[in-house]
Design a protein with these regions (language model features):
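Sec-dependent bacterial lipoprotein signal peptides
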Residues: 1-20
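Bacterial Sec signal peptide processing site at the extreme N-terminus
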Residues: 14-39
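Compositionally biased P/S/T/G-rich terminal and signal peptide-adjacent segments
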Residues: 31-71
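C-terminal partner/receptor-binding element of secreted or periplasmic proteins
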Residues: 45-49, 148-175
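Soluble periplasmic/extracytoplasmic beta-strand elements of cell-envelope proteins
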Residues: 52-54, 66-73, 98-102, 168-170
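Short, well-ordered alpha-helical segments
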Residues: 70-112
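Mixed-charge, low-complexity intrinsically disordered segments
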Residues: 107-161
Length: 175
């Protein structure tokens, strides 16, 4: 009986606390919250400074292995150069030799710059599987219109995206 009362009391306290802005912490504490996708949990490599960019899987080297699958949330009013700088900084920190950029959509919310990491559980050769873009599907489907972001926009200071964006990205090691 005493254990039941304690459990009910703990549940009441947790419900009360969750309404005070601590909902995510409480959910995680009791096992209801998911993983924090902004925390990179993959293979750790030495940082790199020279990173090749590809917009098509056919442009990726045959020896390149995918070690990070990410949806990148970009804030509004970014230039092509801002996007390039943000992406290359993160990819370099993670040790990428090459980055394959998938499609881009207008973001429904402006959450600032965030890299949401979905895996993979094990590295895989890009030539075998790249281009499927199956990770983060629920979030991806909830986004807005398609946005063109390719070689003509990449790295350009004169190209500005007024809305937040969500971009598909995989990071690769090619050594």
């Amino acid at each position: 009986m005493l254990k039941t009362v304690r459990c009910i009391l703990v549940a009441v306290v947790l419900v009360a606390v969750s309404g005070c802005g601590a909902g995510k912490s409480v959910k995680k504490l009791v096992g209801l919250g998911g993983d924090d996708l902004t925390v990179y949990k993959g293979q750790v490599y030495p940082a790199t400074s020279k990173i090749a960019i590809a917009f098509q899987p056919a442009q990726v080297g045959k020896s390149c292995r995918v070690f990070a699958e990410s949806l990148v949330l970009l804030p509004a009013n970014q230039t092509g150069k801002d996007i390039e700088n943000s992406l290359l900084a993160e990819a370099g920190q993670r040790g990428a030799d090459q980055v394959l950029i998938g499609q881009t959509r207008q973001g429904e919310d402006d959450a600032g710059l965030q890299f949401l990491y979905y895996g993979p559980t094990y590295e895989y050769l890009c030539v075998d599987q790249c281009g499927g873009w199956k990770f983060g599907y629920k979030l991806w489907e909830a986004q807005g219109e398609w946005v063109t972001l390719g070689y003509n926009e990449w790295g350009k200071t004169g190209v500005r995206f007024e809305t937040p964006l969500v971009m598909q990205v995989v990071m690769l090691r090619c050594q």
